């Protein structure tokens, strides 16, 4: 079994491509169930800045073909041109770095770990995250906790929502006296509301399709909740609008926002879209009085602040390397131990048989002490013969080496003949590979 990662992110793909693969949760589950046909395991990670599929599979080439087919169907051929791929230990390193927010647009942001955990839980619920992938994710979460504890990267970091509010403050030279609107009461909306309040916004409105969620958030931050049906009226009165909903189509278009212009009498409107797919149609930004930004624009804004966190990121990178090495070694031990156990059982059975044959041939000419000495000699020979292969398997470091040695031992000593025969008789659950042109990276 080998880990594969195929995906795209803000580093490789524009927002127009990423939002095509931003699936609602129900569709993510459908994809997982198609990909995770036993014995393949699958994880689908989707955030505003990345879409990645992780696969643990005995046939890496077959699993890769299936994933590429899904990504092509969902995102079109153009999406394939922006993909990156990692395999084996490199895929593990990438998973750990993503969970630790070392590959995020905003280095060190805390939200990504929660998003990966949600993907993990969704995968478990779909029966797609099992065994090795479950252990890899658990190790990545443990690594992220260690990074948060042992480095200052989280304390030094900002978030997408904080960056959006900083940009709004820069545009208006502060938010004192400004009316702000938060559209969406999820995690990103909650962060935006808190930062807007801290930045000194005079009036804070929160709206959400489910009014009770808007009311709960407004109560926490000292704002006012309004029904979603009042959305455009709220925008008409606002100076700043921050959007982060799960809508699959834009909430704001050039037509419905443009219709508000006459009543505003030229008063500028700052709109920032933290959603993927976007809540704000890009054409809205062509209105003279609207300053519209999306997540890619926020990336440019936060790039200047990344240097302050670079040193902590280096420390975190060392911890990631340590934790990946630990996981790889533990996995090699897990996979090597059954072979060692069968090898020892085989050797001990042979030793017992030969000792009994020898004792039988010698008959009654041996006393008890001599018989025990011969039995001890048989055990000692087994222990000495198996010491070196046992130590070698347990000391193995690089991923794949443990599998190679264990497989060689199993084949040389005929330890897996029964299992191989059973597996050969079992029908394949995977279809023939689909040829997909992968394009550039």
UniProtKB/Swiss-Prot annotation:
InterPro entries: 4pyrrol_synth_GluRdtase, 4pyrrol_synth_GluRdtase_dimer, 4pyrrol_synth_GluRdtase_N, GluRdtase_CS, GluRdtase_dimer_dom_sf, GluRdtase_N_sf, NAD(P)-bd_dom_sf, Shikm_DH/Glu-tRNA_Rdtase. Substrate binds at residues 47-50, 104, 109-111, 115. Coiled coil: none annotated. Pathway: Porphyrin-containing compound metabolism; protoporphyrin-IX biosynthesis; 5-aminolevulinate from L-glutamyl-tRNA(Glu): step 1/2. One of its GO terms (biological process) is protoporphyrinogen IX biosynthetic process from glutamate. The keyword Transmembrane does not apply. Keywords: NADP, Oxidoreductase, Porphyrin biosynthesis. NADP(+) binds at residues 184-189. Its EC number is 1.2.1.70. It catalyses: (S)-4-amino-5-oxopentanoate + tRNA(Glu) + NADP(+) = L-glutamyl-tRNA(Glu) + NADPH + H(+). HAMAP family: Glu_tRNA_reductase (MF_00087). Homodimer. Possesses an unusual extended V-shaped dimeric structure with each monomer consisting of three distinct domains arranged along a curved 'spinal' alpha-helix. The N-terminal catalytic domain specifically recognizes the glutamate moiety of the substrate. The second domain is the NADPH-binding domain, and the third C-terminal domain is responsible for dimerization. This is Glutamyl-tRNA reductase.
């Amino acid at each position: 079994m080998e880990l594969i990662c195929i995906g795209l992110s803000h580093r490789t793909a524009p927002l127009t491509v990423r939002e095509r693969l931003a699936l609602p949760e129900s569709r993510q589950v459908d994809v997982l169930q198609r990909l995770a046909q036993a014995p393949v395991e699958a994880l689908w990670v989707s955030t505003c800045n990345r879409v990645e599929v992780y696969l643990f599979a005995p046939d890496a080439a077959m699993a890769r073909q299936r994933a590429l087919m899904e990504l092509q169907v969902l995102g079109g051929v153009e999406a394939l041109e922006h993909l990156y791929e990692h395999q084996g230990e490199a895929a593990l390193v990438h998973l750990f770095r993503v969970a630790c927010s070392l590959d995020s647009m905003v280095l060190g942001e805390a939200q990504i770990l929660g998003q990966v955990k949600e993907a993990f839980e969704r995968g478990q619920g779909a029966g797609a995250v099992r065994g090795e992938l479950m252990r890899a994710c658990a190790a990545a979460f443990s690594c992220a906790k260690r990074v948060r504890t042992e480095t200052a990267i989280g304390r030094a970091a900002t978030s997408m929502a904080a960056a959006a509010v900083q940009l709004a403050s820069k545009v208006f030279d502060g938010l004192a006296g400004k009316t702000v609107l938060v559209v969406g009461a999820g995690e990103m909306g909650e962060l935006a509301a808190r930062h807007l309040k801290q930045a000194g916004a005079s009036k804070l409105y929160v709206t959400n399709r489910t009014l009770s969620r808007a009311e709960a958030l407004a109560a926490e931050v000292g704002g006012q909740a309004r029904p979603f049906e009042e959305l455009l009226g709220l925008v008409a009165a606002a100076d700043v609008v921050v959007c982060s909903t799960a809508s699959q189509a834009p909430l704001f278009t050039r037509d419905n926002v443009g219709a508000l212009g006459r009543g505003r009498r030229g008063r500028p409107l700052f709109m920032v879209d933290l959603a993927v797919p976007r809540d704000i149609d890009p054409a809205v930004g062509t209105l003279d009085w609207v300053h519209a930004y999306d997540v890619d624009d926020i990336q440019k804004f936060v790039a200047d602040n990344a240097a302050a966190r670079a040193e902590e990121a280096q420390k975190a990178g060392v911890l990631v390397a340590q934790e990946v090495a630990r996981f790889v070694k533990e996995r090699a031990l897990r996979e090597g131990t059954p072979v060692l156990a069968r090898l020892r059982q085989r050797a001990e059975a042979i030793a017992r048989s030969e000792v009994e044959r020898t004792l039988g041939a010698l008959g009654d000419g041996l006393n008890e002490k001599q018989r025990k000495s011969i039995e001890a000699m048989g055990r000692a020979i087994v222990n000495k013969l198996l010491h070196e292969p046992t130590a070698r398997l347990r000391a193995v470091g690089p991923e794949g080496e443990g599998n190679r040695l264990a497989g060689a031992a199993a084949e040389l000593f005929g330890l897996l003949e029964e299992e191989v025969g059973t597996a050969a008789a079992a029908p394949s659950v995977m279809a023939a590979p689909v040829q997909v042109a992968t394009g550039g990276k």
